[in-house]
Amino acid sequence: RVADASKSDDSANMLLRDVVTLGRYIGPRLSEYAQKTQKKVDVHTYPSGTTVIKAFTANDFVFLDSKKHIIEDLTTESIKSVAAVKITWRIQKNRQNGQSITLAADNKFPDLCPVLSAACMVIRARRLIQPDDMPLAIYQTRKGERLYLTGGKIAELLRGAVKRIRPDISSEDIKWYSAHSLRVWACVLLDEAGKSPDYIKKRLRWLGDSFRMYLRDTAVIQHQHVDALRLASQAIMDLLSALPEDVIALSHTMTGISIDPQMQEYADEED
């Protein structure tokens, strides 16, 4: 909704839409798409003195058509034939540098397609004359200034969107929405979908089990718990319905029985 209200495809809100849509699939770490400040690029410096840009660049995305052919010239027209995107992490926190993950396009829900959002980010950056080897998450203000996305800006945009949907949200609850929310959200979505821990770790690039701290007791999980015991519940009800009436009556009368406080310990090997 926030993106729909934007008058420019190069606005911060439009960039946010693409980052969120892609983020719900790949669960990016903040440094992988944003900068600490709006005008300076964050780099990692190796002991040798070599530096590498932390955030995604256009060069990290390879777009493929339905026949697995690389789409060299990505435009608003050729974007229609994009069927998948291969994303490469040149550098990341877990040190699995060079890791690649391929995402398939969601043709059923194009507005939520991570592949189209990734393509839009590349097209936007090139439209803003951003070199392919420089950070991809860039937008243009109404005054024509080109700025990098930051963690603070992400939090501001996310909280603004949440307030539009939930105007009664408390000042304390709104603080839970931050740039890190994207990684948490991606993790929760896969957990709700019933994916295994190994699957979650593989697709969201976790080496250990630290992702478990992000799992939430969501409504989806709660209903899954009920559904998981549905057959067992039915079996119990079938068993109860098959009991003789006198046994059922006896069980009902026993529910009102209380413990005799005067009775001492009663020794018996069986409960």
Predicted regions and their residues:
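Extended, non-catalytic subsegments within catalytic or DNA/protein-binding/adaptor domains
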Residues: R1-D271
